[in-house]
Amino acid sequence: MTPDLQKAGAAILERHQQATVAASAGGASFGRTLLGDEPDFEHGVALYLEEISVSFDGFKALNSLSLAIDVGEMRCIIGPNGAGKTTMMDVITGKTRPDSGRAHFGSNIDLLRLREPQIVRAGICRKFQKPTVYEELSVFENLELALQNDRGVRAALFARMSGPQRERIAEILQLVHLLPEAYRIAGLLSHGQKQWLEIGMLLAQEPRLLLLDEPVAGMTDEETERTAELFLTLVGKHSLVVVEHDMKFVDMLTQGHRKVTVLHEGSVLAEGTLAEVQSNTQVIDVYLGR
């Protein structure tokens, strides 16, 4: 385990030990600390995975995977098919329970104790490769539903929106390049625009961590560039984990200095700048090719 992972793990362990002492002394309950709505980012770590292993019928999809994502960081995850990228995100979002290991959001939320809806409420949102929007509704209505996600579809559409809510939707529309398309039916948007709309719907939920699975798959070159611009504006306010195969897009996001993680056979094969991992002989052999 690398020194930065050891440091992150030590901080989280210390936080949990403090909570245990408080609970035994009659203070705040340990369960409440782990399941609280607000993640504690005091130590600067947004997401911490330690020795996560997952097996399916004898196949190890994740093999003692350890990873730490800092608050406000954008991390690109690359690797060959079957490397464990999707399973990793399934564990983070509660879709898959690991055989062993630890997964924490901030220093106080144990993700392995939460169900999928609780993880979303804690501030983790996931975007799949294929966009999922309400195609029969307008772009604005899609964002309205996302903003009022505690209501049903019908109730949300007929509820009166406040001024701040309308302003928030306008901000998101501007951010995701869809302001001119606000009242267009979502089903008429291009593939890239649907991707932007879904990202906007996630942003309406005010996530602290965004998990993005091949977000530019099927996009034009222009849409890919504008998506990179969008993600770069989110850095700092949100933490982002971007799973991607498009090395040109990864280069746009990392800008020569952000860290890239390479997965292989369920564990971390290499980490560093894009240039560093591209020159790594192991990465070349198993993923990039010679």
Q: Where are the regions a protein language model picked out?
A:
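The feature captures the beta-strand-to-loop junction immediately N-terminal to the Walker
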Residues: 78-80
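Conserved ABC ATPase "signature" region
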Residues: 31, 36-40, 156-181, 229-232
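Helix-to-loop junction immediately C-terminal to a conserved catalytic motif
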Residues: 93
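Catalytic Walker B motif of ABC-type/P-loop ATPase nucleotide-binding domains
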Residues: 210-214
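ABC ATPase NBD Q-loop/coupling interface
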Residues: 102-122, 161
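Conserved ABC nucleotide-binding domain
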Residues: 112-113, 172-188, 193
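ABC-family P-loop ATPase nucleotide-binding domain
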Residues: 1-53
